[in-house]
Design a protein with these regions (language model features):
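Terminal "cap-and-tail" regions of soluble proteins that handle hydrophobic small molecules
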Residues: 1-23, 119-220
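Short beta-edge strand/loop motif at the mouth of beta-sheet-based domains
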Residues: 22-24, 28-31, 37-41, 49-87
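Hydrophobic alpha-helical segments that drive targeting, anchoring, or assembly
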Residues: 35, 75-78, 92-94, 117
């Protein structure tokens, strides 16, 4: 498995937004990038039960408005909005916590732009790990999507898991985490606090924290 880490991560624009939601402090991480395809094809890759496992994870459920979904070994939830081929939103329920994803597609010249926003209420895990908790995972997913759209070849999940433990894979986690640290600082967070959280998250994704530490993306 070969990924040009610097190139792939450099294609993504990242931001962090802090705000109040239903009287609680919340934060949204946003990733946006272009893909070498059209909106209809990108929409199908993101929403087809047959195609999602080819670049992300096996999925079960009813993939339509109001339907429930479950990603194997990961999040599940309910689809709360769906306007093909431009927009969908869903709850993201994982590790006992609920957050929210919002995905928008737009044509841009001969390409398709994907914008993904993941919103969570700020709780202990956010204060411990920061935006990289979900941001690194989404960087990995968007890289997998690029590879699939470019070649049509499905991700071999065993190979991908082995790659994540390789020096190149660990380098991806580190560089992604540093991008998220910078986005966190740009949102107005104290740089020292942002670095402490990103260092912790990078260590987790690199497999350098005790195994009993909960996944930083759970939010619980």
């Amino acid at each position: 498995m070969q990924i040009d880490v610097a190139r792939v991560l450099g294609l993504v624009t990242r931001s962090v937004r802090n705000f109040e939601m239903d009287g609680k402090a919340a934060s949204a991480v946003t990733l946006t990038r272009l893909y070498e395809t059209d909106v209809d094809d990108l929409w199908d890759a993101l929403t087809s039960k047959e195609r999602i496992p080819r670049w992300f994870l096996p999925i079960e459920g009813d993939l339509q408005l109001g339907g429930k979904y479950q990603l194997k070994g990961n999040a599940g939830g309910t689809i709360t909005a769906c306007t093909p081929p431009r927009h969908f939103a869903a709850t993201w329920e994982f590790g006992g916590a609920t957050s929210w994803i919002d995905v928008r597609l737009a044509a841009e010249r001969d390409k398709a732009r994907l914008t993904l926003e993941h919103t969570a209420v700020i709780e202990d895990h956010w204060n411990q790990f920061g935006p990289g908790a979900v941001g690194i995972g989404w960087d990995l997913a968007l890289a997998g999507l690029e590879g699939y759209l470019a070649t049509g070849a499905s991700v071999d999940h065993e190979t991908a898991e082995a790659w994540m433990g390789s020096p190149e894979g660990k380098g991806f986690m580190t560089e992604s985490g540093e991008f998220w640290r910078a986005a966190h600082v740009a949102s107005g967070v104290d740089p020292a606090s942002a670095k402490e959280r990103s260092d912790r998250t990078i260590a987790f994704y690199r497999g350098e924290m005790p195994p009993d530490i909960a996944h930083p993306g759970t939010g619980s």
